[in-house]
Amino acid sequence: MDPRMHTAPPAGHPIQPGYQLEDNPYHHQQGFDIPAGPGRYSPGDALHIQTPQPIEGMGGYNAPGQHYTPDYAVNPEEHHDAYYNQPYEPQVGHDPYAAAPTPPVAGYQAHDDQRPMLMHTDSQVGQSDPYHDEPQPPTNNAPIKRWKTVKQVLLYRGNLVLDCPIPPKLLNQLPHGERDEFTHMRYSAATCDPSEFYEENFTLRQKLFSKPRHTELFIVVTMYNEDEILFARTMIGVFKNIEYMCKRTESKTWGKDAWKKIVVCVVSDGRAKINPRTRALLAGMGVYQEGIAKQQVNGKDVTAHIYEYTTQVGMTIKNDVVQLIPKQQPVQMLFCLKEKNQKKINSHRWFFQAFGRVLDPNICVLIDAGTKPGGSSIYHLWKAFDLEPMCAGACGEIKAMLGTGGKNLINPLVATQNFEYKMSNILDKPLESAFGFISVLPGAFSAYRYVALQNDKNGQGPLEKYFAGEKLHGGDAGIFTANMYLAEDRILCFELVTKRNCHWILQYVKSATGETDVPADLTELILQRRRWLNGSFFAAIYAIVHFHQFFRSDHSFLRKIAFFIEFVFQTVNMIFAWFAIGNFFLVFKILTTGLGDEKLLGTVGQILGVVFAWAYGVTLITCFVLSMGNRPAGSPRLYMGMVVFWAIIFIYLMFAAIYIAVVAIQTDVQKGLSFTDLFRNELFYTLIVSVVSTYGIWLIASLLMFDPWHMVTSMVQYMLLSPTYTNVLNVYAFCNTHDISWGTKGDDKPDKLPSVNTKDGQGKTDLPDEGDLNASYERELQVFSRKYVKPVTAPTSAQLEEKQMDYYRGVRSMVVLVWMITNFALCAVVLSTAGLERIDPEEGSQEQQTTKRATIYMSVVLWSVAVLSGFKFVGACWFLVVRMFRGV
């Protein structure tokens, strides 16, 4: 075996067999010692590394991978001890050129770039050859300069895998500098589908240690183009949870080395879509390096760029600027940068089918970038699985991010969503958890038992149903199925509980919380709820229709009865949701008509009723027309006007309900009605008791959960905007059932990357020179070191075209509205309907009034037709007379 394979390099330098990148080779040098940083080290943490080799002097050198038989290269696990168990044991050599020995420090201080890298004699280099210095690294403000960076790369198990040194500037700030997982970032170019990752011999670092690490918790953070603030917010929460578990020294599972059992996976949906500031933040943590990724390997397109690194860099947010904090708790990071934008469900395929199959974790935690888990929330989620062996999935409480001192509550939309989230977590989730089936575990913060997710031997099961949605988007799927898979997390929950011959349940963990930013803009809220409402509606129908699948499970008879009761409850709720818009109008009509009674508001009530009825109809028709033809972003003022109108309608209805009830009670009291007789008054019972019971249950339940503050800060806003949910959000959702998109645009084309072609397992490629590492690292730090200022850029041609189309759509919608409303007004006036009969009553019955108006209208129409026809006839006759005299 070649003694050069497992020799450790100076920090910040590539692990190479000692070949200088200049034209002249090295002088013969001896080895030297690397100062070891503080911390625990065990032979089990020794990590096999795969590194590029400089191309000069490659003659006569056999690649490290070629020292083994093909069986070793393809199946190293079968020869584990011989292949991996070679712990790091540096020796001090007698080097006449080496610097004076220095005491150990927290990190390796690589100030002298002239020291030799290895402690063996290179058989290919003569001792008389001179030694040449490397070029000096460029200054921080200069572009990355490429020295002689063409290097020989060796395929690992037939795949391109590179272990790249992290920048010395970063390494010098970190302890444990002697260990490969801290000194090197591992890059793998995946050229396959996620489902083929394991079969294509790809692996992950946790399986390459001399003692492979067991992954108890596998956390995925999915992101699209979130900025560095949102990403840092999530990572801060995740890191705090890992620190919390490392402090649980009395735990049988966790303790000071708990971080070795946790892997944090970040999956970014598209290389062209990732936010540059977020990418720079990942580089600052040591997880990402520019210039490493490849476009193709041997003609095969790279589908995902996988970076692995154990970071010791934490972060904090001050004044909207992310600041890095070195020497923090180690965290095993896995960053998957997908080449193309393929939606969130594809990101989960990489997580479950590719990485999950390699690591075989116990619990998988799903978090959206921007969601900040509480300091011990992930632990509490894990604890739910530990206490209940049959728990297949769990979720925590999703909280709306309210800002410092609750400043975001000033926005009524945020306050409304805060109240909505709170009541869902106080009433809905606990009820479903009591039955054992939660209709949806929110993808923003939830966890699953990996074993429960697996398909059966025929390839059928929860994951198969979950990932079926990826093939349906843009395919030949029916509209029902396509909309159903907008809420594929609901399908996953249903499939878990109904899994054949199993009895898995789902639980709600209130002590686990996750803060997420909610839409603060009406346009964003409409688009979000379109996806939620359509997905949940069609997924609920799917669950109800396929309820019989519960009987294929292994649940007890009592549990199945409980599921039946829960589904009856959900069916009733869905029926009410379907008829919500009609029920709201009927309540409006009954209350406004009642106010027109002579004992109440009389004529004033009648006039107000007619005005509001006409405004109601016009607003609702406007919403339908806009929903079917306009983008919310193209008509923001009209949508905001509708929200204001529905809030006014709600205030009027509340006034009507209270006023009618009070007058009715006063009348009964004057007749000597006792207090007990009040509950026999049908009007009082219908209006007052139902309203008080609803709001009373909200208050009592909130107090029982020790979480009542939303009743004070957000209840009024929620009540005022509740008609908007029925008459705007529902209307827009149902009018856009044809839209099965997630609201993302098509792919931007990313920059072209270099390719690698190999022969006999070896090839050449361009890689960043070590002299550029610090300069590149400094540049990445500068990207997010200042508060983000949105650049003022001229709109693109596509944006201008979209704006023009919004204008055209707006004009079109206004023309249609005027046309519809004027025709409706004509019919209402002629037939004396839509409340006009109450404003201008005439003698005689209603039928006689209608007949009289219709007769007059028909006379006007018929005489008008006759006059117009006569006018045309006169014109035709005049034409004939003129033609007779002109002869043409």
From Swiss-Prot:
Coiled coil: none annotated. One of its GO terms (cellular component) is chitosome. Pfam families: Chitin_synth_1, Chitin_synth_1N. It is an enzyme of class 2 (transferase). Its EC number is 2.4.1.16. It is a multi-pass membrane protein. This is Chitin synthase 3. It comes from Neurospora crassa (strain ATCC 24698 / 74-OR23-1A / CBS 708.71 / DSM 1257 / FGSC 987). The lineage of its organism: Eukaryota, Fungi, Dikarya, Ascomycota, Pezizomycotina. The gene is chs-3.
